[in-house]
């Protein structure tokens, strides 16, 4: 039995292109929205008022060439008239013009005006519907609506135009069905008022969007669907599930019908033909998208919709008929000089047309049941079926009001069906007895038939009908040649399309509160392939929420619908696809394939797979597929359709290939047609044909490093194990399994865990164990360990295990297991303890039984596939899965992953009865998943940072990283790989081009790339600063930018980038910071300039005094500033060695270490986060008898800075808690210091081991000075030395307040700031006496 299922789903954006404005999605502007439109709106209302007053006075105005109002049959001409009343009126493009039409109607249109006819009581009414528009007022799609419109009602479907009449405004909704007559309209009902245009307009705006396709059709040969919406035709590739092309027509027209004209040679190529609502025919070449010709209708005022159409098979000729028409219009595109003509002969309107698939025969049927056969060579009718006296149920044919005609794909017979269900099947129409009825009967009794099509391969036809319950059904019917009747086919059960909610792809928050029901009205089937779709139409009971004018404030219009969704169906060969199908061998990648340089790009030589008939191989390097065994492995002569006598139907389920011994194992289901029984069997065969073993078995697996094979018996209670060798397969040994086992899976674990069993009876996964417990040396390790001594994983009662994959790392001796079930994916350790898992989403709409389809280990990242995406997940359970790429086809089974693409097995959409596997590849980017997986390892799998860095460098060098997400960059910065993160982000040219200067600045700032950050910051600052008359938003942005610049300048100072900091503070006019930097750089010119500016301002006396003190300094020393460093090796203090100190975020003046007089060694653990030096952690101090410098260099040094300008700046600018009491710069001790530590100090006082006395800087990732402010202010700072000036010693040794630094004026190499600090400290002693001095810790 076959089954109908969804094979693809097309989703197209419901948005208007920028190049045109379609009337079907006109913006309905309700109110005075734009200030610049007030005058235009006022002018329009004046014109409407004038026309309304003149409506009863200008019924028959004379024709005029240059008048303002034209009436009668002539109307006004296009050159002069502004308003046309009656037929024929026109107008300039910049004015309001009436469109053409007959009668006394008034038409107000945009541009050339709306078309249609109407009476003198309608404005823009009639066939085509008029439009009111204003060119130059936000395009030609602006519409004014009256306020007094309570609701909108409908009698048909979604619409496309808005027109104005005497009772208000109507929104016209055009029919999507070819069987429904003229388009209906949604009337915006309002009471008749004296002036419908004088009301105040509310201030609201809505978009009228289409939510269904106007028409659909398939390519004659390729798997391509053409879908029309508004004036667009979208080309949708069913295999790749993507839109591959788009065509446009005039924006004022709407496409209503599509049909393809198949060609059989270069002279007669395939054409795509479109009928518009206005009656124009467009012809394209779909391969080149070139417009071939445009054909206008015979009568310009004929606005009737097309009811039926058909195309010649091998000639570009189209036949169609319009509503209530008795003629067939013929358009021959082959003869370019010919005009459309008509075939006449029917007495009643034509109901159906069908062309013979191979011959020049056309069949047509009218509403009175008359069937005529035409010869298209001479356009003459040679058969007329009017007499049904020989048929006993002739009277029933008269009860049908509509008929359907369909030819069998080869032309063997013609099916004629009435809407009542009576069906007549005529044989060969060119035979001697063409009127012979070879079969007849009633179909779909008690139902209303909507559409009939014939399957392109199977001998059956599909009927779409509406059942008594009101739901649509799709049934299949075939001819019983023995009894000459028409019976329902047992091959395909009745299918009820699940399309009543075509907006199911939207979330519940995006849907309108009330949704119209979407009904299928016709079947659209592929001419040669196994695809079909359903043309949809909205039901007649559309509520007011479809209106652009919602009934209440909580209702949502259809402007929220931004996509159109359409399902494409196919007929599968089986009820469901087995999860292990397609049958392709797995090539797992060893650990380190991408991480280690020597393993990268070692491509596998070939991939072996079973295509359903042959064993083949796929070469990844060139994409060539070849047969490995010439003889077919599996042949289904019954074609899967239940015929063929005693033949068997086979379906492969599992395929394994052993590369070492060049043999494969195949598990397949064999269905006996004669016995009506199904068995599961196995086949073991080598490529040379020397080994060929078959038998009964439900599952198999290679175990013991692929040296053995285990076959699971049919009942799941027997395991048959054989040893493999180059000579063949040994005899099988049988082992009893208790309880019943469902499937078996291999493991890389040693010892007893050689097999992993899935027991559905117990709903668990268990390992095997040794049968002979008394003899561990025995290798019979196949007993089920139901007690769980080795580990057990309990599953849900209805959970089924499909696939298990292992990843083993010899470096960390870890084994990780990934388990794929029908409900979730589980990652466990070697004892089946869950590390991470993801569940399938609730109520997922999939044709297969499982949401997940396959899994594959890529280093420490697990890749898995769904029906739409390739995803990845890591070993951290707090990270959500992320997509890698979309999948064009489904379902697929991953075979292997290469650095630039993935290779997978895929079952193509084939003719029913065939089961075929193909191997394909798809380009993907795997850099992100590799990096995230490596940086998201759990605690029990840890690598050294140097190894991680080498792995990351190898990945980046070998793989493409032109596209990488922000999540990866943040993860790298989080793990201190800032340099790598910035280099990646800087090389992403595509991504960089889309970022603003502010975003680039933030990215460089985060990555500690100060020069690049300053460059981008300057660009953004210059851009905003030149804006004249900025608004409030721009002012807020500028203030925020200044804050970022201030913080960035401070950080540049902390990192030693003084020139960059100076550039920032110059833009901000931060004079104190500029003076600080100038003194640090010994830049006297800058100090003079700062002083001059301060004198002009006259508001900063402290700054002036500081400048004077510095400039009055007589001794001028050379500039010698040692920037902050990460590491200070063991050193001897000299007269030329200066060290910078940090207070909060500000670095103070460098100090010479020889100026320190005394120090205090602290004997307790010291923390830089202490509130002050008088805290409890600093009470145990030794007397200051030790002289500076220390002899062993094994202590950190804590000093307090003198009262310098820097301390003044730090205190003055400390408004955001930038200052801490103590900070530290580290130094690495020498090996001699470490050796003497245990002898000099007692480590027991610090509650730690000797190896933890000093900081280990081996893990520092960056060599730049950006990490200078990363201190060791924690409990690991075991011993520190506090310095206290001798002149300020108090009786209490724990009270440390300040430090005196001696000046050495004779030392010209000493930094000038050391001396300046002492002099400036005397400048404002009175000002600073009440200011607490920050304490700075220097760790040498």
UniProtKB/Swiss-Prot annotation:
- Keywords recorded for this protein, A-Z: Repeat, WD repeat
Q: Where are the WD repeats?
A: 208-246, 250-294, 345-384, 397-436
Q: Which Gene3D superfamilies match?
A: YVTN repeat-like/Quinoprotein amine dehydrogenase
SMART domains linked to this entry: WD40
**Ranges for region Disordered:** 56-75, 110-131, 1216-1340
Q: Which InterPro entries match?
A: Coatomer_complex_subunit (IPR050844), WD40/YVTN_repeat-like_dom_sf (IPR015943), WD40_repeat_CS (IPR019775), WD40_repeat_dom_sf (IPR036322), WD40_rpt (IPR001680)
Q: Which PANTHER family match?
A: COATOMER (PTHR19876), COATOMER SUBUNIT ALPHA (PTHR19876:SF1)
- Tell me the subunit arrangement: Component of the TSET complex, a heterohexamer composed of tstA, tstB, tstC, tstD, tstE and tstF, which may act in plasma membrane turnover. tstA, tstB, tstC and tstD are likely to be the core complex members with tstE and tstF acting as associated scaffold proteins.
- Protein name per Swiss-Prot or TrEMBL: TSET complex member tstE
């Amino acid at each position: 039995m076959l089954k109908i299922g969804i094979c693809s789903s097309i989703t197209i954006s419901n948005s208007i292109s920028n190049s045109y404005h379609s009337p079907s999605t006109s913006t309905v502007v309700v109110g005075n929205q734009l200030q610049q439109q007030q005058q235009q709106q006022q002018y329009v209302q004046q014109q409407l008022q004038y026309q309304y007053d003149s409506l009863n006075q200008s019924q028959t105005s004379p024709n005029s060439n240059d008048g303002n109002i034209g009436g009668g049959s002539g109307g006004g001409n296009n050159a002069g008239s502004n308003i046309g009343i009656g037929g024929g009126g026109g107008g300039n493009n910049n004015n309001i013009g009436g469109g053409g039409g007959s009668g006394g109607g008034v038409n107000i249109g945009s541009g050339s005006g709306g078309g249609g006819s109407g009476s003198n009581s309608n404005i823009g009414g009639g066939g085509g519907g008029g439009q009111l528009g204003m060119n130059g007022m936000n395009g030609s799609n602006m519409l004014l609506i009256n306020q007094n419109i309570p609701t909108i009602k409908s009698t048909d479907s979604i619409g496309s135009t808005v027109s104005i009449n005497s009772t208000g405004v109507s929104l016209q909704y055009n029919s999507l069905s070819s069987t429904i007559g003229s388009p209906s309209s949604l009337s915006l009902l309002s009471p008749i008022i004296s002036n419908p245009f004088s009301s105040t307009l509310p201030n609201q705006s809505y978009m009228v969007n289409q939510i269904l396709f106007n028409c659909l059709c398939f390519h004659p040969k390729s798997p391509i669907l053409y879908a029309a919406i508004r004036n667009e035709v979208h080309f949708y590739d069913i295999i790749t599930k993507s839109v591959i092309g788009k065509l446009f027509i005039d924006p004022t027209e709407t496409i209503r019908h599509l049909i393809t004209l198949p060609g059989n040679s270069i002279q007669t190529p395939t054409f795509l033909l479109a009928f518009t609502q206005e009656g124009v025919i467009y012809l394209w070449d779909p391969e080149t998208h070139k417009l071939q010709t445009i054909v206008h209708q015979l009568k310009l005022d004929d606005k009737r919709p097309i009811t039926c159409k058909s195309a010649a098979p091998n000639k570009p000729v189209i036949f169609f008929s319009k509503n209530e028409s008795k003629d067939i219009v013929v358009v021959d595109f082959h003869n370019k000089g010919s005009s459309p003509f008509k075939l006449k002969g029917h007495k009643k309107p034509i109901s159906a047309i069908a062309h013979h698939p191979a011959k020049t025969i056309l069949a047509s049927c009218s509403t009175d049941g008359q069937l005529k056969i035409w010869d298209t060579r001479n356009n003459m009718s040679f058969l007329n079926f009017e007499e049904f006296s020989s048929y006993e149920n002739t009277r029933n044919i008269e009860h049908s009001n509509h008929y359907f005609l369909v030819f069998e794909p080869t032309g063997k017979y013609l099916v004629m069906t009435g809407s009542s269900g009576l069906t007549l099947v005529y044989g060969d129409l060119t035979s001697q007895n063409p009127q012979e009825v070879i079969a007849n009967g009633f179909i779909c009794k008690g139902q209303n038939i909507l559409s009939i099509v014939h399957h392109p391969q199977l001998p059956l036809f599909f009927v779409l009908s509406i059942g008594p319950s009101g739901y649509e059904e799709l049934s299949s019917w075939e001819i019983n040649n023995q009894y000459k009747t028409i019976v329902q086919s047992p091959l395909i059960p009745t299918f009820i399309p699940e399309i009543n909610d075509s907006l199911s792809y939207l979330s519940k928050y995006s849907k309108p509160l009330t949704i119209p029901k979407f009904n299928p009205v016709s079947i659209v089937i592929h001419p040669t392939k196994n695809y079909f779709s359903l043309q949809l139409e909205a039901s007649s009971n559309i509520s007011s929420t479809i209106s652009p004018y919602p009934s209440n404030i909580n209702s949502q219009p259809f402007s929220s619908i931004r996509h159109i969704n359409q399902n494409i169906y196919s007929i599968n060969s089986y009820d469901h696809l087995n999860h292990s199908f397609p049958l392709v061998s797995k090539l797992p990648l060893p650990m380190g394939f991408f991480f280690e340089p020597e393993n990268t790009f070692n491509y596998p030589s070939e991939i072996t797979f079973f295509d359903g008939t042959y064993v083949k191989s796929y070469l990844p390097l060139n994409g060539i597929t070849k047969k490995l065994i010439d003889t077919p492995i599996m042949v289904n002569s019954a074609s899967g359709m239940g015929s063929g006598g005693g033949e068997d139907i086979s379906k492969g389920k599992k395929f394994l290939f052993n590369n070492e011994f060049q043999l494969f194992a195949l598990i397949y289901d064999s269905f006996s047609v004669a016995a009506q029984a199904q068995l599961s069997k196995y086949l073991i065969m080598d490529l040379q044909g020397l080994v060929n073993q078959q038998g009964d078995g439900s599952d198999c697996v290679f175990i013991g490093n692929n040296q053995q094979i285990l076959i699971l018996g049919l009942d799941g209670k027997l395991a048959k194990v054989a040893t493999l060798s180059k000579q063949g397969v040994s005899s099988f040994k049988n082992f009893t399994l208790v309880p019943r086992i469902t499937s078996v899976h291999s493991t890389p674990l040693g010892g007893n865990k050689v097999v992993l069993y899935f027991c559905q009876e117990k709903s668990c996964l268990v390992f095997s164990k040794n049968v002979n417990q008394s003899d561990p040396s025995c290798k019979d390790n196949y007993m089920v360990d139901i007690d769980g001594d080795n580990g057990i994983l309990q599953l849900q009662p209805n959970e089924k295990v499909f696939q298990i994959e292992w990843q083993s790392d010899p470096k960390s001796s870890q084994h990780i297991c990934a388990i794929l079930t029908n409900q979730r994916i589980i990652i466990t350790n070697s004892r089946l303890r869950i590390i991470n898992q993801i569940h399938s989403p609730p109520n997922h709409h999939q044709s297969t039984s499982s949401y997940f389809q396959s899994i594959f280990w890529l280093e420490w990242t697990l890749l898995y596939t769904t029906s739409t995406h390739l995803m990845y997940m890591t070993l951290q359970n707090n990270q959500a899965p992320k997509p890698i790429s979309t999948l064009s086809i489904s379902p697929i089974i991953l075979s292997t992953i290469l650095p630039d693409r993935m290779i997978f097995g895929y079952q193509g959409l084939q003719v029913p009865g065939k089961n075929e596997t193909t191997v394909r590849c798809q380009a993907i980017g795997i850099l992100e998943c590799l990096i995230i997986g490596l940086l998201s390892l759990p605690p029990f799998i840890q690598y050294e940072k140097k190894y991680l860095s080498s792995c990351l460098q190898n990945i980046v060098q070998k793989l493409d990283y032109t596209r990488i997400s922000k999540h990866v960059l943040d993860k790298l910065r989080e793990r201190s790989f800032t340099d790598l993160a910035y280099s990646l982000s800087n090389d992403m040219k595509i991504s960089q081009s889309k970022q603003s200067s502010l975003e680039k600045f933030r990215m460089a700032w985060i990555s500690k790339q100060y020069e690049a950050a300053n460059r981008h910051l300057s660009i953004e600052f210059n851009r905003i600063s030149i804006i004249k008359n900025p608004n409030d938003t721009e002012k807020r942005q500028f203030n925020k930018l200044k804050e970022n610049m201030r913080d960035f300048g401070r950080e540049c100072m902390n990192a030693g980038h003084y020139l960059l900091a100076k550039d920032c503070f110059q833009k901000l006019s931060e004079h104190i910071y500029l003076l600080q930097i100038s003194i640090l750089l010994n830049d006297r010119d800058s100090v003079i300039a700062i002083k001059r500016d301060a004198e002009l301002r006259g508001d900063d006396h402290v700054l002036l005094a500081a400048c004077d003190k510095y400039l009055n300094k007589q001794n001028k020393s050379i500039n010698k500033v040692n920037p902050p460093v990460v590491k200070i090796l063991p050193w001897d203090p000299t007269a030329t060695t200066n060290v910078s100190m940090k207070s909060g975020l500000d670095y103070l003046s460098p100090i010479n270490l020889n100026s320190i007089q005394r120090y205090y060694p602290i004997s307790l653990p010291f923390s830089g986060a202490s509130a002050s030096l008088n805290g409890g952690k600093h009470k145990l101090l030794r007397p200051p008898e030790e002289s500076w410098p220390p002899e062993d260099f094994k202590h950190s040094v804590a000093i307090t800075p003198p009262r310098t300008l820097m301390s003044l700046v730090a205190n003055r600018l400390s408004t955001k808690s930038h200052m801490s009491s103590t900070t530290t710069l580290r130094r690495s001790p020498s090996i001699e210091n470490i050796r003497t530590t245990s002898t000099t100090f007692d480590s027991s006082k610090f509650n730690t081991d000797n190896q933890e006395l000093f900081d280990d800087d081996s893990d520092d990732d960056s060599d730049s000075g950006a990490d200078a402010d990363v201190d060791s202010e924690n409990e690991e700072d075991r011993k520190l030395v506090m310095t206290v000036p001798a002149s300020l010693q108090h009786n209490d040794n724990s009270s440390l307040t300040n430090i005196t630094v001696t000046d050495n004026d004779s030392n010209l190499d000493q930094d000038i700031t050391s001396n300046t600090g002492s002099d400036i400290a005397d400048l404002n002693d009175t000002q600073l006496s009440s200011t607490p001095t920050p304490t700075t810790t220097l760790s040498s």
